[in-house]
């Protein structure tokens, strides 16, 4: 079957607060955005940008939409920050940080805003960027569990972790292009295997971003830099 990439976003960790849309639509849709931990802020920013490009709006009739998120460290940085607030006694523990000590909070926030009711879950991924999320998203579509899936990669590295890429990358895959010109067409075969219509195999989110050829979506934007 043919599926379509209808939205994509790359949000490097160092740039999340500089994006102008954070003060516009995203501020209106996520009134608590300023209280989110950084992990949730970056994830919501990327999902919102990709979903908006794909034509999704809060209240849109398409509800059978899911999100699969993968990453290696999850919300570990927030978990450590919360634990630090407990050291002087449990009565001083931060209730705000506690609210974000699970990596699935971010996708729950996004699904709630758009009214999505499809498969929504988090995977531990240590392979290529977003390969686990992309494979599961494709499989959910192939099995008929959803009409559209967002495959997402989100990574914030704790200070003790090896240096590497940080930020979020999100791809929107749909079975119907809704009369619009998609960013990319892909072939989805049995077993959830994805390939470009030219036959080139797609395994990671980076493969899709590279195929789109948009400098603003280049995977290299997520790589670590010496300066913010």
Tell me the role of every PLM-derived stretch:
Residues 1-135, 139-146, 151-228:
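Conserved "HGTGT" condensation-loop signature of ketosynthase/thiolase-family condensing enzymes
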């Amino acid at each position: 079957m043919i599926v379509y990439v209808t939205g994509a976003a790359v949000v490097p960790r160092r740039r999340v607060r500089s994006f102008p849309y954070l003060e516009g639509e995203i501020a209106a849709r996520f009134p608590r955005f300023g209280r989110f931990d950084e992990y949730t802020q970056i994830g919501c920013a990327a999902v919102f940008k990709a979903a908006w490009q794909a034509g999704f709006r809060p209240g849109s009739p398409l509800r059978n939409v899911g999100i699969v998120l993968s990453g290696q460290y999850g919300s570990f940085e927030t978990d450590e920050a919360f634990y630090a607030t407990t050291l002087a006694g449990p009565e001083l523990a931060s209730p705000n940080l506690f609210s974000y000590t699970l990596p699935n909070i971010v996708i729950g926030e996004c699904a709630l805003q758009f009214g999505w009711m499809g498969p929504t879950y988090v995977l531990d991924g240590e392979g290529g960027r977003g390969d686990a999320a992309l494979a599961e998203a494709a499989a959910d579509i192939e099995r008929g569990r959803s009409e559209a899936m967002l495959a997402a990669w989100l990574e914030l590295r704790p200070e003790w972790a090896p240096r590497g890429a940080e930020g979020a990358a999100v791809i929107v895959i749909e079975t119907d292009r809704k009369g619009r010109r998609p960013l990319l067409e892909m072939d989805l075969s049995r077993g959830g295997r994805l390939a470009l219509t030219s036959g080139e195999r797609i395994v990671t989110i980076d493969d899709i971003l590279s195929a789109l050829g948009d400098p603003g979506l280049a995977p290299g934007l997520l790589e670590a830099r010496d300066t913010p």
